[in-house]
A protein has these predicted regions:
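Noncatalytic modules at the cell exterior or secretory-pathway interfaces
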Residues: 35-41, 84-107
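Residue-level recognition of well-ordered beta-strand positions that form the cores
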Residues: 29, 40-42, 54, 96-98, ...
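Short alpha-helical segments and helix-capping/turn motifs at coil-helix boundaries
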Residues: 24, 79-82
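Edge beta-strands of jelly-roll/beta-sandwich modules across compartments, strongly enriched
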Residues: 49-51, 103-114
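An N-terminally biased module of ancient metal coordination in phosphate/nucleic-acid-related enzymes
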Residues: 127-170
C-alpha cells in the first residue's frame, strides 16, 4: 500500500524571490489520523542551486537540515537527525525552504509531503549512522557571573566571498 500524499508544491524560484524573502514557508494541512510524516525535496539538476530544508509544526519549530538532506521523516518515536521527534500532527504545518543559492535561470523544486508509518520510520532510522558514544568529560569550570546571568558558549561566524558565501562583510 502506498503512502497517502498530503501535499505537493512545485515552484521555480528566481533570484528575485530570494532577494524578496530568503526563507519560504509552504503550508501543508495534516489530518488527525497521521502517524508520521515524510517530506521529500527534489531540486531539478541545476549547477549552483542550493535549497535548504526545514519543518515547523502547528506548535512550533521541528528542525532544519540545511542543504544536507533531501528527505526527512518526523514521528513521535524518532525523527531524522536535525529534527525533533514530534507528536500531535493535526493542523497546518510549514515546510521551510531556504533559498541559499538561486542561479539566474532559477531553481525548480518539488516538495512532496506524505503520510508515513512505523515500518518506514524504522527502515529510515536503520539507514542513519549510529550515534557516537558520549565521551567522558571532566567537570566544567565555573566562570564568574552576576546573579541570575550565565555564560554561554557560542560560535559567531559568517560565510563571505572569502569562503563559500557570495556576499562581502561590508
Amino acid at each position: 500500500m502506498s503512502a497517502r500524499v498530503l501535499q505537493v508544491h512545485e515552484h521555480t524560484w528566481t533570484p528575485a524571490d530570494r532577494a524578496e524573502l530568503q526563507i519560504r514557508s509552504l503550508p501543508v494541512d495534516v489530518p488527525r489520523d497521521v502517524e508520521a510524516l515524510r517530506i521529500d525535496l527534489d531540486v531539478a539538476a541545476n549547477v549552483g542551486s542550493v535549497i535548504d530544508l526545514g519543518a515547523q509544526s502547528p506548535r512550533g519549530y521541528v528542525g532544519w537540515s540545511g542543504g544536507a538532506r533531501r528527505q526527512i521523516v518526523i514521528s513521535a518515536e524518532w525523527s531524522t537527525p536535525g529534527y525533533l521527534p514530534t507528536h500531535g500532527y493535526a493542523g497546518t504545518w510549514q515546510v521551510l525552504l531556504g533559498l541559499h543559492r538561486v542561479p539566474a535561470d532559477g531553481a525548480r523544486t518539488t516538495v512532496t509531503v506524505r503520510e508515513s508509518n512505523a515500518g518506514e520510520v524504522a527502515r529510515l532510522r536503520a539507514l542513519e549512522p549510529a550515534d557516537p558514544p558520549v565521551p567522558l568529560r571532566p567537570p566544567r569550570r565555573t566562570l564568574p557571573s552576576s546573579s541570575g546571568l550565565t555564560w554561554l558558549a557560542a560560535d559567531f561566524h559568517t560565510h563571505t566571498v572569502h569562503s563559500d558565501g557570495s556576499l562581502s562583510v561590508g
